[in-house]
Amino acid sequence: MGARASVLSGKKLDSWEKIRLRPGGNKKYRLKHLVWASRELEKFTLNPGLLETAEGCQQILGQLQPALQTGTEELRSLYNTVAVLYCVHQRIDVKDTKEALNKIEEMQNKNKQRTQQAAANTGSSQNYPIVQNAQGQPVHQALSPRTLNAWVKVVEDKAFSPEVIPMFSALSEGATPQDLNMMLNVVGGHQAAMQMLKDTINEEAAEWDRLHPVHAGPIPPGQMREPRGSDIAGTTSTVQEQIGWMTGNPPIPVGDIYRRWIILGLNKIVRMYSPVSILDIRQGPKEPFRDYVDRFFKTLRAEQATQDVKNWMTETLLVQNANPDCKSILRALGPGATLEEMMTACQGVGGPGHKARVLAEAMSQVQQTSIMMQRGNFRGPRRIKCFNCGKEGHLAKNCRAPRKKGCWKCGKEGHQMKDCTERQANFLGKIWPSNKGRPGNFPQSRPEPTAPPAEIFGMGEKMTSPAKQELKDREQTPLVSLKSLFGNDPLSQ
């Protein structure tokens, strides 16, 4: 404890033990608070020896302050303790922790105003990563570990998907070739992809050397040499030379040129990691239109084509590769429809509501077809009539009226319409009276006589005259038989 408590001694220790923890409270700071602060700094991988000086306390405050909004109570207590200790080192008279925090805030505001005033006096902004020093000279500021960590995390999570390219562009804005090489070197995996990227960079560097040959003769005094392809790639140039080219008059943006080469190589890598062609993106039968559009544009980002070609793909393939339901809707909108109009029109296609509507339309068409098939003598469609209620326009199976009892044809009970014999005709067109025996198109059950009647031989009966016999034959209706129909048919003999 002695080594940890040796941060303060003498008058500084007396001043430390007079400061209260809270305004109006009884508890005051003791040596145990210094011991606790040293242990907490070790947990945050900070050097406890920084507590011995005011500059060290200021560095600790700068590291802890960004995490105060989301930090724990222990982190806030550590920040408060270091703030009070800084006031003790600077011999700033404070009575409690709150007053010390106010002093720290005032000091930070003054420093911020001084920095802004200095930037205004120099007349130039401090653009990252090349900033102006106190003498107004451009100096290089290396990429922060947070930026490098964000880049590595994107590569590990996305595995060179299309969104890696805009992320790289955002993180490498204004970077020097040395910064760009650092971003490429921190990528641990995907070495095959990184080798492809190096090959692309070498090809572009060779093309640069071919288009920008070296001028013969010595370099004039005060001027810089022209950058070669390897200089732009950062392999044969120093940071000072890169800054000189980027800030010269006229400037040579070696950082932007190198970044453009890297993006070109990343496009090839993304194309390799995304083997699906835009021509293969088709909407599934039950896939929502929104998900289909998301897959379409994600694949479109990986296509190696100009913006005009991508616009043509969007206007043509987006409609052409949609499912039949969405395609009919999109074609009805016309060629000038926007994506918002397409998304709105196809919203809900494939869902329960759309399925029910399509099923209802299909059933309506089937019912209409069955109605059209009910024709009279093939003269055209006619209105159907319900056998239950007698009204036109619907069938008996769809009738809402109470079910009618008995036969729908004759109105009598005891049988159904299919068994009704009321005015039923045979194929000869003759009405079959159900109460007069069998129909005439059936073979007659009465056998034909083989001998003449008894009246002819005069067995006690009186002979009838031919006139009376003819009148009797006229009154008696002849029976219809198949024999009378077919005449001398040999099969009927």
Swiss-Prot record:
Region listing for Interaction with host CALM1, in residue ranges: 8-43
Modified residues (Phosphoserine): 144
Gene3D superfamilies, per database record: 1.10.1200.30, 6.10.250.390, Human Immunodeficiency Virus Type 1 Capsid Protein (1.10.375.10), Immunodeficiency lentiviruses, gag gene matrix protein p17 (1.10.150.90), Single helix bin (1.20.5.760), Zinc finger, CCHC-type (4.10.60.10)
Residues marked Cleavage (site): 128-129, 359-360, 372-373, 426-427, 442-443
Short sequence motif named Nuclear localization signal, residue ranges: 26-32
Region annotated Interaction with membrane phosphatidylinositol 4,5-bisphosphate, chain positions: 73-77
UniProt protein name: Gag polyprotein
Natural source organism: Human immunodeficiency virus type 1 group M subtype A (isolate U455)
Gene from which the chain derives: gag
